[in-house]
Amino acid sequence: MVSARLRKTDLVVDLKALGANVQRQREQLAPGSRILAVVKANAYGNGMVPVASALARAGVEGFCVALLDEAIELRDSGIQELVLVLGITPVEYAPLAAAQGISLTVGSLEWLKNYQRLAKEEGIKQPLKVHLALDTGMGRIGFTTPEDFKEALQLVAAPCFEFEGIFTHFATADEEDATYFERQRARFDDFMAVVTKRPPFVHVANSATGLWHQKSIVANTIRMGISMYGANPSGVGIKESFPLEPVTSLVTHATYVKQLKAGESVSYGATYTAKEDEWVATLPVGYADGYPRRMQGFYVLVDGQRCEVLGRVCMDQMMVRLPKEYPVGTEAVLMGRSLDQEITVTDVAEYAHTINYEILTGMGARLHRRYLG
């Protein structure tokens, strides 16, 4: 995929803000607690390797990714800290992880037994680092009974494993009603009752838990995800317990400016028709870049002023109404600040009837990433 350096459009990533968010989260944690920075999905669209490198300098203790391929890319880029693959990796690829000191998530007895057999057959000497996943109510992956978990604890004592962690994931930590959260927390306690010796990393807190439930959790590690990138995990549902600085901005420049006459229409389906003469700018950003097609009627910022998105967003371009004639090359902010005005990723998500996670992770590969700090 081409990173388009020759169009004046940047996804701007503020690494100082990223570090500030990590520091603010750390201030909320008990002394000695550790942070695993979640950099899966290209660091939520921000660029995995540059973001991880900045976070390593900021002192995070490790990283979480979704795929073994992502973990290998981090190792290849020089990242030496713990790297945990949160998804399930096929057993046949586990030797690659063992060779590079990459930690894998395990959620079944069958997987552990299959790897034991594979390690013996292939003569693998390097122990595989594993984190045992517990399904306390997310219903996704993990051991579902304390009995199976207890057997897993016995299996990971084998020489082919290095038992590094235990974790679960809360399904409703970003909601005001804590009933289901408390049910999951109690279920986690049931699992932990069979543990005779805790591994180095016990992590149950995601971004939402870190913002609103951290003091009720007995664990030594937090997985910091979307809050690290300056976005509220609940969207607009619950106010953050500490301030977050937005990390990601999307900035472009007008490629075409014209006067639209009354009665003339704009974009596919002719869904917008001018009621009077007005100035219109074409911007070189579209839904192929991750800006949602359904944003007609929303706005961008030009010179600190809200400028309405006219018609449907196209694959590569979009049109906005200007308050007056502006020259080609005028800056337009789709996410971020312009003078005293701001559009957050959550603002975009709310208008698009989705979540801020989807907007960030959907930022396209052809957007040129520009890093500050």
UniProtKB/Swiss-Prot annotation:
SMART domains: Ala_racemase_C (SM01005). PROSITE patterns: ALANINE_RACEMASE. Belongs to the alanine racemase family. Its EC number is 5.1.1.1. Gene3D superfamilies: Alanine racemase, Lyase, Ornithine Decarboxylase, Chain A, domain 1. The active site is at K40 (proton acceptor), Y268 (proton acceptor). The lineage of its organism: Bacteria, Bacillati, Bacillota, Bacilli, Lactobacillales. Pathway: Amino-acid biosynthesis; D-alanine biosynthesis; D-alanine from L-alanine: step 1/1. It catalyses: L-alanine = D-alanine. It comes from Limosilactobacillus fermentum (strain NBRC 3956 / LMG 18251) (Lactobacillus fermentum). Transmembrane segments: none annotated. This is Alanine racemase. GO terms for cellular component: cytosol. GO terms for biological process: D-alanine biosynthetic process; peptidoglycan biosynthetic process. The keyword Isomerase applies. Substrate binds at R140, M315.
